[in-house]
Amino acid sequence: WSLWWSSYAIWLKGHLGLTGTELGTLYSVNQFTSILFMMFYGIVQDKLGLKKPLIWCMSFILVLTGPFMIYVYEPLLQSNFSVGLILGALFFGLGYLAGCGLLDSFTEKMARNFHFEYGTARAWGSFGYAIGAFFAGIFFSISPHINFWLVSLFGAVFMMINMRFKDKDHQCVAADAGGVKKEDFIAVFKDRNFWVFVIFIVGTWSFYNIFDQQLFPVFYAGLFESHDVGTRLYGYLNSFHVVLEALYMAIIPFFVNRVGPKN
């Protein structure tokens, strides 16, 4: 999804001409909707184990990204912003913002079931994101529609990979997952440590996300005389940043296993 998400803010503001207020509204509604889908995905996937109906849903959304972005989302944002806002939040929440967490959770279940290191496997996802971000800036400077069609193409590849994965032990994994009850949710909200963690996330990750996804891409691309050059160079910069992230993801599990998580 780095083929379009890494330059999402630049596309919205530079190509579609949205205001800063509209941009912030889009991001906030997208994130709020994704939270609802995350809770749904978490409960359902815990019961499914390694069964893949939700992964199939995500596959179809990836394939439909190109047509949706070009023929539905882009025209609606320019002609009927509110409708485009709602449809986009539902689409991105199902397939990307919450879908990314779903895929991480699914991979973690596979790691425990097949006894491989999740962090090292997850690093390959970051390497893939870095490659996508590198070319995203180049293609965006030509036409953003190229990026959207490429997402659909790779979504079809993802679907074919999904078809090839047939695990005979998924029933066992699903059986090990206990049912989530209403009391479990209430207990979490009564836990003081949970609210301390929420405040920590709001004060760190949330503000960093605003800077990283909304402010910095537009600011950096605007430093150059040509908007296309700025978009291309931002893709290079973002790619290098994610490569470093992937390297740390690959080596940190070995360090954590040696010194312990708390240390």
Residue ranges and their predicted role:
Residues 36-50, 140, 247-261:
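Helix-to-loop junctions at the C-terminal end of transmembrane segments
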Residues 146-164:
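Symmetry-related core transmembrane helices of the 12-TM Major Facilitator Superfamily/SLC fold
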Residues 9, 41, 131-140:
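Small-residue (Gly/Pro/Ala) motifs that create kinks and tight helix-helix packing interfaces
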Residues 31-39, 129-130, 134, 242-250:
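Residue-level signature of mid-helix packing/kink "hotspots" within the transmembrane helices
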Residues 1-35, 193-201, 205-225, 230-237:
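Helix-loop boundary and gating motifs at the non-cytosolic
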